[in-house]
Amino acid sequence: MYVKELFVDNFRNLQKQKIEFCEGINIFYGLNAQGKSNLLESIRLLSMGRSFRGSKTTELIKFGEDYFYVKAIICQENNDKKIEFGYKKNENKVIKVNGNKIKSTSELLGQLLTVIFSPEDLNIIKEGPSHRRKYLDSCISVVEKNYLYNLMQYNKILMNRNKLLKSIKEGKSKSILEIFDDQLVEYGAKIIVMRQNYLKNVEINIKKFLLEISNETAEIVYLNSVGLKDASDEEIVKKRLKEKLSKNIDVDLRYFTTQVGPHREDFKIIINGYDSRVYSSQGQQRTAALCLKLSEFEILKKETSEKPVLLLDDVMSELDENRKKYVLERLKGFQTFITHTTKRYLKGDCYFKISNGVVIKE
């Protein structure tokens, strides 16, 4: 799988243009704030249906305009696939695959497989549990077909349960709560099991990568909501989650929120026996984040039997020569997009200069 060409119109600061890419390593260079990251963002948008920077869809429109449109031609097994994403202010976004409009962003997942590496990856390690849950959910959604559906159903039931908790406090009967609990357990257990299985694979990869890069040990600790060391048996997880919800009802009623479930979970990356978020140096944390992203790439490649497209947004300047060489070696043979302020010291198959939103192929 690789991106043959990209067409952008009114996307961020990028000028209206069509760009053709190489199958191998594509280097995009230029001064800061010229549009390098925006180019990668447009490709990632066609892959995941949202900005990797956390921007709202309306913020992707060029200043002074009222719409944007992005289109890519993807080559997959010698067949071309067209993916389009359009959005006009105050209207619904329109996403098409081969000319057919899709109903939801979830249908887009898997059409263009990408892995994004950026300096913000460090936040997965350094920030709070919500960052790690969001990252985990994003990764699993691409390789597990039903994960996003289960997550959406769980969140909808959770929201209704929390509303009910407030109503019970105001005098409504508790009897309906059991119905919500049964539904919450049904979807929650599936989420927990899929997270457990995914993190097992992450641990295998991270152990290998960290040992090869810096000769350090690593493990993943999944802080699941049911208190199990191994939460891979769905029936056991269901039973434990149901027990936890019942036991916690008084606390839930006190705070009007559900205190137990996948929405409160976390995972730790342990380096040399210590929690990397708390005790590791920034250099170690950056290496841990790099290994996490390399693991995402390996799992995606294995589970889909496809070649993901790699997007490296200004990460080369963050890596020393040893880590830079290691990353490029692992990504050899895959279409890769690299942004940097200079093309020096970077070996690519195609070079593009970006200035004021104009992409010029050399």
From Swiss-Prot:
Q: Which cellular components does GO assign to this protein?
A: cytoplasm
Q: Where is the protein found, in the record's own terms?
A: Cytoplasm
Q: Which domain of life is it from?
A: Bacteria
Q: Keyword set for this entry?
A: ATP-binding, Cytoplasm, DNA damage, DNA repair, DNA replication, DNA-binding, Nucleotide-binding, SOS response
Write out the residues that bind ATP.
Answer: G30, L31, N32, A33, Q34, G35, K36, S37
| InterPro entries given in the database record | DNA-binding_RecF (IPR001238), DNA-binding_RecF_CS (IPR018078), P-loop_NTPase (IPR027417), RecF/RecN/SMC_N (IPR003395), RecF_2 (IPR042174)
Biological process GO annotation list?
DNA replication; DNA synthesis involved in DNA repair; double-strand break repair; SOS response
Matching Pfam families: SMC_N
Q: Please explain the role this protein plays, according to its UniProt record.
A: The RecF protein is involved in DNA metabolism; it is required for DNA replication and normal SOS inducibility. RecF binds preferentially to single-stranded, linear DNA. It also seems to bind ATP.
Q: NCBIfam families in the record, alphabetically?
A: recf
Cited HAMAP family: RecF
Family matches, as PANTHER family: DNA REPLICATION AND REPAIR PROTEIN RECF
Q: What name appears for this protein in its UniProt entry?
A: DNA replication and repair protein RecF
